[in-house]
């Protein structure tokens, strides 16, 4: 070893020891004939002092981020010179030898200053030397280890599934890899290990997991990555409660890493209730401000805007004091989300109603509105009217925005809930409008994916009543973030083929794309279910990071670009010819 001790491990009890440290020069300070450096390694920082002779002369050439090895004696710092902000603040190392292991060029940014994201990603190897980013990756390693420990106790088997497979419709576009030995044909990088883990259940593995790399060629969305990581699990001979129980044990172990005792079992809320009360399927439960249904209250209204399939409201406490410019800003805020605007009523200090909507209400409506929605004098009532899904989504977004503006969200709180009783299908046009890919050519598509089992009471009727069919599915939400989703799977060929048919995937197409799975179901497939956790998002939450990029070693920037390596990049004409990208695949029999 080139060092005897870690820089962050030294304490006053080590005084008098000869040590060898190795790391980077975090700071250098010249105090008139004495040079101090903060020497940083993965464990922390120690102060090193160069006082005289050749070692002092050598220290004059040190600059930030030089990689060095230092020999010296641990000394207790003089009284008054201690640094209580760091664990090693009571000692310093009096250097007797200095070796420069690697010089550093002038830095593109100072590591202890803020830097732009593009520069940080281009020089990610420098960015990771900083305490925050480096600490996040080390936490990620602990997260992996904690999950593996729980799963080992439950006899799970860690199995790697292929990362080059065939393209199958799973809800997003595939990344494609040309097959050189079969010109015109392509592998696909997996969007998830879904089909392989189900095949492993058919194979009798019973309990599988994998920390899996997944790939989705999606249009750019904020804080999405084209390649990401899941903790993927599957279990045979289980129901939803069994999968949820193991999942909660994992979550409890993960949050224990940051000193939080997660109480289990976690609460559950149905999808319908989440949409009704919070306007979203991933509700943030750290604060109140629930939506209020107003359709019946305005059943006889003459106000045409409120003669809609859905009318709802959310109250902004103290919002009546907002100036007109701020209220107009809410309209722009709503239009940015595809709405025409955000109707509002102001409740005066004396209880009278004001604003442009109030004059369109009857006396009875004005008299009873505040009580119906739970508004007090000085509050603002925001409304949405129209199709239920989009109107609730607008109010749900307004609820979050209100909470942010009023500082109602406790940043230290953790609020978990399972969302259960999901619809099995949604209209394909609704999925497309929401930015998702509607799998299949039918009018209906799967809300989760095509392999989700219907609940028992919906199994016989989902093809005649798709709107009312419920899925045996469950998502886990933390602080308004979906951090995992799973379901009991279909394990019978006839049920799977009926689901495909509902989605417009007819027999021949299903056999071509999923025949291997359908065939497997004919060989005694066990009931099974599982879940996949968004590992990047979970780690970001634990690290208190706003973006998943902060917990990924080498993330992509917006649009999937990699400033570090310059990927994606053009290929050479020779590579294009050899890969067979432009070749037409041979037809059967040719």
Swiss-Prot record:
Gene Ontology annotations of biological process type: aspartyl-tRNA aminoacylation
Chain residue ranges for the region called Disordered: 557-590
Keyword Protein biosynthesis part of the UniProt annotation: yes
DNA repair as UniProt keyword: no
Chain segments carrying region Aspartate: 194-197
InterPro entries assigned to the protein according to its UniProt record, in alphabetical order: Aa-tRNA-synt_II, aa-tRNA-synth_II, aa-tRNA-synth_II/BPL/LPL, Asp-tRNA-ligase_1, Asp-tRNA-ligase_1_N, Asp/Asn-tRNA-synth_IIb, AspRS_core, GAD-like_sf
Residue spans of biased composition, Basic and acidic residues class: 575-590
Site (Important for tRNA non-discrimination): 31, 80
Positions bound to ATP: 216-218, 225, 482, 534-537
PROSITE patterns named among the record's database cross-references: AA_TRNA_LIGASE_II
HAMAP family noted in UniProt: Asp_tRNA_synth_type1 (MF_00044)
Record family assignment: Belongs to the class-II aminoacyl-tRNA synthetase family. Type 1 subfamily.
Quaternary structure, from the entry: Homodimer.
Protein name, entry field: Aspartate--tRNA(Asp/Asn) ligase
Organism whose genome encodes this protein: Mycobacterium sp. (strain JLS)
Gene: aspS
């Amino acid at each position: 070893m080139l060092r005897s001790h870690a820089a962050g491990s030294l304490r006053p009890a080590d005084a008098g020891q000869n040590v060898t440290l190795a790391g980077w020069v975090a700071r250098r300070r010249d105090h008139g004939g004495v040079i101090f450096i903060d020497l940083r390694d993965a464990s922390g920082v120690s102060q090193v002092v160069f006082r005289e002779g050749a070692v002092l002369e050598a220290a004059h050439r040190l600059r930030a981020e030089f990689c060095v090895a230092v020999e010296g004696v641990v000394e207790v710092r003089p009284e008054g010179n201690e640094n209580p902000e760091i664990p090693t603040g009571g000692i310093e190392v009096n250097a007797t030898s200095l070796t420069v292991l690697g010089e550093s060029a002038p830095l593109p940014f100072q590591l202890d200053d803020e830097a732009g994201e593009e520069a940080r990603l281009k020089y990610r190897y420098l960015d990771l030397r900083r305490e925050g980013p480096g600490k996040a990756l080390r936490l990620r390693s602990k997260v992996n280890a904690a999950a593996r420990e729980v799963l080992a106790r439950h006899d799970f088997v860690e199995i790697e599934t292929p990362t080059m497979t065939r393209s199958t419709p799973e809800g997003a576009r595939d990344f494609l890899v040309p097959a050189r030995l079969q010109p015109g044909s392509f592998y696909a990088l997996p969007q998830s290990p879904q089909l392989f883990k189900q095949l492993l259940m058919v194979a009798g593995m019973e309990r599988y997991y994998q920390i899996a790399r997944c790939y989705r060629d999606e249009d750019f969305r904020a804080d999405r990555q084209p390649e990401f990581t899941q903790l993927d699990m599957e279990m045979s001979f289980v129901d939803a409660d069994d999968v949820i129980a193991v999942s909660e044990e994992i979550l409890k172990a993960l949050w224990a890493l940051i000193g939080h005792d997660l109480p289990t079992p976690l609460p559950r809320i149905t999808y319908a209730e989440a949409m009704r009360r919070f306007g979203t399927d991933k509700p943030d439960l750290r604060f109140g401000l629930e939506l209020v249904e107003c359709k019946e209250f305005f059943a006889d209204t003459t106000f045409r805007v409120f003669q809609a399939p859905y009318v709802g409201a959310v109250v902004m406490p103290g919002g009546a004091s907002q100036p007109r410019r701020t209220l107009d800003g809410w309209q722009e805020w709503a239009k940015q989300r595809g709405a025409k605007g955000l109707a509002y009523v102001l409740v005066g200090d004396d209880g009278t109603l004001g604003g442009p909507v109030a004059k369109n209400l009857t006396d009875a409506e004005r008299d009873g509105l505040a009580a119906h929605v739970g508004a007090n004098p000085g509050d603002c009532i925001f409304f949405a009217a129209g199709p239920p899904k989009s109107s609730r989504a607008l109010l749900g977004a307004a609820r979050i925005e209100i909470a942010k503006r009023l500082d109602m969200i406790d940043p230290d709180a953790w609020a978990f809930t399972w969302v259960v009783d999901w619809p099995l299908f949604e209209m394909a046009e609704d999925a497309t409008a929401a930015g998702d890919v509607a799998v299949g050519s039918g009018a209906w598509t799967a809300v989760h994916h095509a392999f989700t089992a219907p609940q028992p009471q919906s199994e016989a009727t989902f093809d005649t009543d798709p709107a009312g069919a419920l899925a045996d599915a469950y998502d886990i939400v933390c602080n308004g973030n979906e951090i995992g989703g799973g379901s009991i799977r279909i394990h019978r060929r006839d049920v799977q083929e009926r689901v495909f048919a509902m989605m417009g995937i007819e027999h021949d197409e299903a056999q071509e794309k999923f025949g291997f799975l359908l065939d497997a179901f004919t060989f005694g497939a066990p009931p099974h279910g599982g879940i996949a956790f968004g590992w990047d998002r979970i780690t970001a939450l634990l690290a208190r990071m706003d973006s998943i990029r902060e917990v990924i070693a080498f993330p992509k920037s917006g649009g999937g670009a990699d400033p570090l390596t310059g990927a994606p990049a053009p290929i050479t004409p020779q590579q294009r010819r050899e890969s067979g990208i432009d070749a037409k695949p041979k037809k059967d029999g040719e």
